[in-house]
């Protein structure tokens, strides 16, 4: 039986179309009311998009809550692995939107992890030139990162998330009780993004995780610490997004670990590593690059590595050719005027964005990672 807890509200204070991130156990049963509270009219048509592993335990609760609030609801269940994160799957969502007679006043609800959220958000952004979307993340990674901030998109054979749009949600609802059925590997993958926030600016969060004997499972963290992690991580993401909605400057720091991480995902093949696992490897890699450049201490790099390992995440760089890595890096979305930008750690709780990393430094870093 899910324990109902009070809802915690975090405001994403955008200049246009601000919205709330609502967190609390039993939140899924209150989704319909929360949408009404967010100003959505009760007679709207809603298409809920989910995947089998989520729709089975949580689909009925979601649909019942929406119908009780007066919404007309249809459910679409799709496969949602990284291999399915394609324009073809988005077209499947569009087909369902057509069948459900979604209008410009209608909404889509993404019930699932980051892949469901990314694809549903992109489908909403492109249906009838844009309809509203509500994000209901059910994985740790989606709760603390992917569902907040409006980044949507799908993969291209040449790289991850190369096709996409910024499309902010009307509401984000996080029900931590859905983590109870999340596979342990998926939970660990989400911890990579939590650790990332510690490096980016929350030193106390990093140290709290270091002091935890087992940060790799909900039980190891404990309910109180897990609730705190969700709230602090979501608040950190909300602050950055509010300050820089479309990644003109500050928001780029959220890509810490992602530059090398996307290389790992792309070259190893989508699905070999979960996104959070690849980010963990990428964090270790860029940490090594920062040590090589003299901007980060070896002690801090080892603290990061130990915490990532204690969360049950991989740290070893895969066997990839240097040429393939360099080619993949040049296709990264963060390239500006032909210069690749890295989010580089300078301490536990501080980073900087650098665009002066040379080809030789990257090659030296890759050699170090092999050892």
Curated annotation (Swiss-Prot):
Gene3D superfamilies in the cross-refs:
3.40.50.1970, Dehydroquinate synthase-like - alpha domain
Domain of life, per UniProt, equals Bacteria
Q: Which UniProt keywords apply?
A: Amino-acid biosynthesis, Aromatic amino acid biosynthesis, Cobalt, Cytoplasm, Lyase, Metal-binding, NAD, Nucleotide-binding, Zinc
Query: Which molecular function GO terms apply here?
Result: 3-dehydroquinate synthase activity; metal ion binding; nucleotide binding
Which GO biological process categories is it annotated with?
Answer: amino acid biosynthetic process; aromatic amino acid family biosynthetic process; chorismate biosynthetic process
Annotated residues that bind NAD(+) are located at 114-118, 138-139, 151, 160, 178-181
Cofactor binding annotation: Binds 1 divalent metal cation per subunit. Can use either Co(2+) or Zn(2+).
What the entry lists under CDD domains is as follows:
DHQS
**EC no.?**
4.2.3.4
Cellular-component GO terms for this entry = cytoplasm
List residues traversing the bilayer.
none
Q: Which residues bind Zn(2+)?
A: 193, 258, 275
| Pathway given in the UniProt record | Metabolic intermediate biosynthesis; chorismate biosynthesis; chorismate from D-erythrose 4-phosphate and phosphoenolpyruvate: step 2/7
Report the cofactors: Co(2+); Zn(2+); NAD(+)
Q: Which InterPro entries match?
A: Dehydroquinate_synthase (IPR050071), DHQ_synth_AroB (IPR016037), DHQ_synth_fam (IPR030963), DHQS/DOIS_N (IPR030960), DHQS_C (IPR056179)
Protein family according to the UniProt entry: Belongs to the sugar phosphate cyclases superfamily. Dehydroquinate synthase family.
What is known about what this protein does? Catalyzes the conversion of 3-deoxy-D-arabino-heptulosonate 7-phosphate (DAHP) to dehydroquinate (DHQ).
Stored HAMAP family: DHQ_synthase
Could you identify this protein by its name? 3-dehydroquinate synthase
């Amino acid at each position: 039986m899910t324990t109902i807890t009070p809802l915690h509200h975090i405001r994403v204070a955008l200049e246009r179309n601000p919205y709330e991130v609502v967190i609390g156990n039993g939140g899924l049963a209150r989704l319909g009311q929360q949408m009404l509270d967010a100003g959505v009219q009760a007679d709207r048509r809603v298409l809920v998009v989910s995947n089998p592993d989520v729709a089975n335990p949580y689909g009925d609760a979601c649909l019942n809550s929406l119908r009780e609030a007066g919404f007309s609801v249809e459910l679409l269940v799709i496969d949602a692995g990284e291999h399915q994160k394609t324009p073809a799957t988005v077209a499947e969502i569009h087909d369902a939107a057509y069948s459900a007679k979604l209008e410009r006043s209608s909404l889509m609800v993404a019930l699932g992890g980051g892949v469901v959220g990314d694809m549903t958000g992109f489908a909403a952004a492109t249906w009838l030139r844009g309809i509203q979307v509500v994000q209901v993340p059910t994985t740790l990674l989606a709760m603390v990162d992917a569902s907040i901030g409006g980044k949507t998109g799908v993969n291209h054979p040449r790289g991850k998330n190369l096709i996409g749009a910024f499309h902010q949600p009307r509401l984000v609802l996080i029900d931590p009780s859905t983590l109870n059925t999340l596979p342990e590997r998926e939970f660990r993958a989400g911890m990579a993004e939590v650790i990332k926030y510690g490096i980016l600016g929350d030193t106390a969060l990093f140290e709290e995780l270091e002091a935890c004997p087992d940060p790799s499972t909900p039980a190891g963290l404990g309910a109180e610490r897990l609730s705190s992690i969700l709230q602090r991580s979501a608040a950190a993401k909300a602050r950055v997004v509010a300050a820089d909605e479309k990644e003109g400057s500050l928001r780029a720091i959220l890509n810490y670990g992602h530059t090398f991480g996307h290389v790992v995902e792309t070259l190893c093949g989508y699905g070999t590593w979960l996104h959070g696992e690849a980010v963990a490897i990428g964090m270790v890699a860029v940490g090594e690059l920062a040590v090589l450049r003299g901007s980060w201490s070896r002690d801090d790099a080892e603290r990061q590595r130990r915490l990532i390992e204690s969360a049950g995440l991989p740290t070893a760089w895969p066997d990839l050719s240097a040429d393939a890595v360099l080619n993949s890096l040049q296709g990264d979305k963060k390239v500006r005027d032909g210069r690749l930008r890295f989010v580089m750690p300078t301490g536990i709780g501080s980073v900087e964005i650098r665009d002066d990393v040379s080809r030789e430094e990257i090659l030296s870093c890759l050699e170090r990672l092999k050892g």
